[in-house]
């Protein structure tokens, strides 16, 4: 699920933190990809009449089809992907997982009913909600990646946290996930839409955490508290708190301790803290997630030539993929992996850290821009009000 409304809030309050570009802009970069999120997107995207793609023997192949072709597209564009799989979920997440399972069970029943009585849209909507990434899906995807020569790692717990640790440690340029909590786990750069299909024509979003914090004028701990207040996978949300209220509360009360105290002191009781709301535990999971450090021997990743015959055996003989397509894909992969060895020129130069004076100037300019925007909105609103109030003359 990630963090509710976080991207909307970033876009509104700190748009300079987001760069929009094409996949080719990521040429020569190593990227850590949240595998479970990608596999889930392949399972819900590659569907026809509410059914996943299947082999002749009735086995689901959507995840393998998506992984094979999207990974090839990345390598085609000079990217060196590595995939990170979820390990065991933290204990605090068990409540959220139980709720998800309940929703999927209900959705499955609704999907069956929709097949009998509903429209094609109903069938599609409810079928998507029943999709779950299984251990078998993960194991098959890991087998496929090994045959493709693409490295992967299983995280101790959350894949997003491990992706963030690899980006922070300089093993990769960025973490790629649709889950916004990857930013909460402290990835310097988050890429969204990287594994989307070309047909969707969605730009790659490159979100820079330092600019997010600078634009929101927050320290990291405050940002984590904001994310928890917006709604995360570890805790029930506080009903009635949307993105604007969450930002206002953190700015006014500095941290969650202050926010909770303020809410409890209100006589109107418009907002209520859930009985079991261990926000300090959730904060600690973001501050100190269980991850392998970037210098761990298991994080010594190598991109190798694909095992062409192994791919044919697995995808063609076992999963009944088209042999010509698999062989052509493997040949392209082999050729493009050599191209991906080239380094970007920027890799030879370290970015120059901004001075305190430069940061202050940037902040002042951003504040002035915001003030200007507010003034314009006031003038526009006043003009609109006057135009409405102006009496109409009889013709």
Swiss-Prot record:
SMART domains: HhH2 (SM00279), XPGI (SM00484), XPGN (SM00485)
Location of region: N-domain: 1-104
Job of this protein: Structure-specific nuclease with 5'-flap endonuclease and 5'-3' exonuclease activities involved in DNA replication and repair. During DNA replication, cleaves the 5'-overhanging flap structure that is generated by displacement synthesis when DNA polymerase encounters the 5'-end of a downstream Okazaki fragment. It enters the flap from the 5'-end and then tracks to cleave the flap base, leaving a nick for ligation. Also involved in the long patch base excision repair (LP-BER) pathway, by cleaving within the apurinic/apyrimidinic (AP) site-terminated flap.
Location in the cell: Nucleus, Nucleolus; Nucleus, Nucleoplasm; Mitochondrion
Protein name, entry field: Flap endonuclease 1
One annotated Gene Ontology cellular component of this protein: nucleoplasm
CDD domains: H3TH_FEN1-Euk, PIN_FEN1
Interaction with PCNA as annotated region, ranges: 341-349
Cofactor note: Binds 2 magnesium ions per subunit. They probably participate in the reaction catalyzed by the enzyme. May bind an additional third magnesium ion after substrate binding.
GO biological process: base-excision repair; DNA replication, removal of RNA primer
Gene, per the UniProt record: fen1
Positions annotated to bind Mg(2+) 2: 179, 181, 233
């Amino acid at each position: 699920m990630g963090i509710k409304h976080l991207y909307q809030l970033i876009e509104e309050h700190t748009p300079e933190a987001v760069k929009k570009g094409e996949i080719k802009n990521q040429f020569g970069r190593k990227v850590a990809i949240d595998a479970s999120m990608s596999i889930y997107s392949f399972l819900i995207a590659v569907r026809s009449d509410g059914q996943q793609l299947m082999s002749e023997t009735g086995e689901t192949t959507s995840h393998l089809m998506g992984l094979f072709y999207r990974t090839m597209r990345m390598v085609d564009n000079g990217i060196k992907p590595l995939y990170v799989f979820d390990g065991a979920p933290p204990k605090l997440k068990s409540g959220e997982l139980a709720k998800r399972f309940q929703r999927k069970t209900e959705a499955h029943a609704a999907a069956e009913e929709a097949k009998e009585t509903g429209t094609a849209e109903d069938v599609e909507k409810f079928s998507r909600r029943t999709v779950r990434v299984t251990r078998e899906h993960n194991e098959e995807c890991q087998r496929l990646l090994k045959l493709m020569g693409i490295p992967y790692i299983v995280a101790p717990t959350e894949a997003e946290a491990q992706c963030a640790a690899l980006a922070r440690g300089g093993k990769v340029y960025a973490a790629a996930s649709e889950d916004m909590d990857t930013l909460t786990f402290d990835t310097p750069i988050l890429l969204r839409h990287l594994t989307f299909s070309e047909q969707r024509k969605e730009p790659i979003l490159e979100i820079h955490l330092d600019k997010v914090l600078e634009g929101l004028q927050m320290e990291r701990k405050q940002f984590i508290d904001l994310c928890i207040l917006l709604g995360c996978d570890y805790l029930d949300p506080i009903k009635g708190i949307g993105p604007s209220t969450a930002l206002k509360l953190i700015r006014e009360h500095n941290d969650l301790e202050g926010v909770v105290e303020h809410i409890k002191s209100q006589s109107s009781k418009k907002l209520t803290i859930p009985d079991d709301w261990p926000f300090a535990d959730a904060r600690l999971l973001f501050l100190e997630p269980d991850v392998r450090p970037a210098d761990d021997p298991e994080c010594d990743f190598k991109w190798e030539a694909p095992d062409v015959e192994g791919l044919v055996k697995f995808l063609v003989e076992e999963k009944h993929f088209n042999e010509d397509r698999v062989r052509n894909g493997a040949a392209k992969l082999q050729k493009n992996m050599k191209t991906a060895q080239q380094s970007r020129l920027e890799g030879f130069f370290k970015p120059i850290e901004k001075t305190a004076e430069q940061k202050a100037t940037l902040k002042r300019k951003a504040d002035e821009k915001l003030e200007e925007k507010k003034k314009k909105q006031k003038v526009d609103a006043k003009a609109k009000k006057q135009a409405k109030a102006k009496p109409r003359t009889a013709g």
